Amino acid sequence: DVYKRQIIIPADDSNETRALLLLQQEGLIELPEGANAKDGVTTLDIKNDHGYKITTVQADTVAAQFANSDAGSLAVINGNYALAAGLDISKALAVEDASGDAAQTYANIVAVKSGNENLPKIQALIKALKSDDVKNFINEKYNGAVVAIF
């Protein structure tokens, strides 16, 4: 049945690409040779031999759409939205590889005005953010839903 083969993913450019890369990582679809997070891919680019019905919705609605979907459906849900929906990340069938192309491309960054990058307070902030204490906090607090890539 088609409804049992639905995969719900975020519709915005960056998260759609990330979702499709994850689905390819898990062998559910194929993307064009050399597809990567920086170039961006959409559902129009995929090879879908399994016949999944891939539905794109706003990222902040994926968890709710998934909760209301038929048995057998899958969803690719951003960690922050999965947490907000009360989902147990440890039960995820797949997670994005923290060292992978998508995670590295879409990681949060510290951006400062040009010329301020070497200010002592900026350097102190960067050092603190990259500390083992912060990494441990992220790992303990978010249990895999948010991953420190530093």
Report residues per predicted region:
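Short, small-residue-biased leader/transition segments that mark boundaries at the very start
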Residues: 2-3
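Short mixed-charge
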Residues: 29-48
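Stable alpha-helical elements in mature extracytoplasmic
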Residues: 15-19, 62, 118-121, 125, ...
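Periplasmic-binding protein-like
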Residues: 18-24, 83, 87-127, 129-150
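Short beta-strand->loop
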Residues: 7-13, 32, 96
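Short helices/loops that flank or line small-molecule/ion binding pockets
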Residues: 20-22, 43-82
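Short coil/turn segments
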Residues: 11-14, 34, 113-117
